[in-house]
Amino acid sequence: MALFDWHKHFDPVLSYLNETGNTRWTTALKEQLTRRFEDNPHGDMERWHNALQSLPDVADARVDLNRSAITLTSPSGLDPDAMTRLENGLRGLMPWRKGPFDFFGTYIDTEWRSDWKWDRVAPHLADLAGRTILDVGCGSGYHCWRMAGAGARQVIGIDPGLLFMFQFLAVKGYLGQAPVDLLPVRMEDLPADMECFDTTFSMGVLYHRRSPLDHLLELKGTLRRGGELVLETLVVDGPEGYSLMPEDRYGQMRNVWFLPSCPTLLRWLDRTGFRNARVVDVSETTTDEQRQTDWMRFNSLADFLDPDNPSKTIEGYPGPKRATLIAEKP
């Protein structure tokens, strides 16, 4: 199999960034991508690339971005050999954590029902039509596709996980020049104060950051004046000022630092310069929303909860509850 040609996949978004005046990001991004794919490639990258390359060509692929599953169809259909190659290639990109997706009748039942989160968030958003959007910690890009389905002009997702990137490319490979891109970089890799996005999403990221206030300031720096922040994170019950810092792990995750109360989150947003911050949803995460499937065969939420009291994590902390907040940059 040929080596992964990152220029083929990322030159269009680099050109877009140049054309929209983001030359600082373009310069840094070229260096980051060179290091990622040429100087220090991931040990599994060849395997994932081979799986991507093995997917069958479908000349008449169509997509519906507004269903619960991102759905690819073909009016002419796929023959049995192509369907076998399709499933084998997609299984070569396991585990699939964020979705679901439907590739020409092959349904990928992902670990997370990411459509449930979208259904909770979407009614509260400013109209996404014509907006330029950044999705921080986007996983395999499920929500990026839903944003495009809502009419976004350009969506850029960032997530350092290379497997997520290959899963994203499995979808994009059938869509041609869709205005959605996924960059395998971290939030910290972005230039400060770009101020170029109309909406920035950060969902499932804040609790992984040692300094949550710095993360909020970084997010604010991505937004133009009047831009909208959509923040979703783990929370706990408690008064303003209260935040849980786990002793070690939370739900078996090592990299969880702060689980604030909703009043504390509102104060953080106020102190970091956002306006009109409000809580639009609070939902407990259940084993119906996050679970082991045939496409993600490792441990999942049920294994991270106390078997005698599933309202608590296995470490004895309150079970996962997620809040979505929306705020604007003045």
Swiss-Prot record:
It catalyses: carboxy-S-adenosyl-L-methionine + 5-hydroxyuridine(34) in tRNA = 5-carboxymethoxyuridine(34) in tRNA + S-adenosyl-L-homocysteine + H(+). It holds the Pfam family Methyltransf_9. One of its GO terms (molecular function) is methyltransferase activity. Carboxy-S-adenosyl-L-methionine binds at residues 98, 112, 117, 137, 187-188, 203, 207, 322. CDD domains: AdoMet_MTases. One of its GO terms (biological process) is tRNA wobble uridine modification. Its EC number is 2.5.1.-. InterPro entries: CmoB, Mo5U34_MeTrfas-like, SAM-dependent_MTases_sf. NCBIfam families: PRK15068.1, tRNA 5-methoxyuridine(34)/uridine 5-oxyacetic acid(34) synthase CmoB. PANTHER family: METHYLTRANSFERASE (PTHR43464), TRNA U34 CARBOXYMETHYLTRANSFERASE (PTHR43464:SF95). Belongs to the class I-like SAM-binding methyltransferase superfamily. CmoB family. Homotetramer. Catalyzes carboxymethyl transfer from carboxy-S-adenosyl-L-methionine (Cx-SAM) to 5-hydroxyuridine (ho5U) to form 5-carboxymethoxyuridine (cmo5U) at position 34 in tRNAs. This is tRNA U34 carboxymethyltransferase.
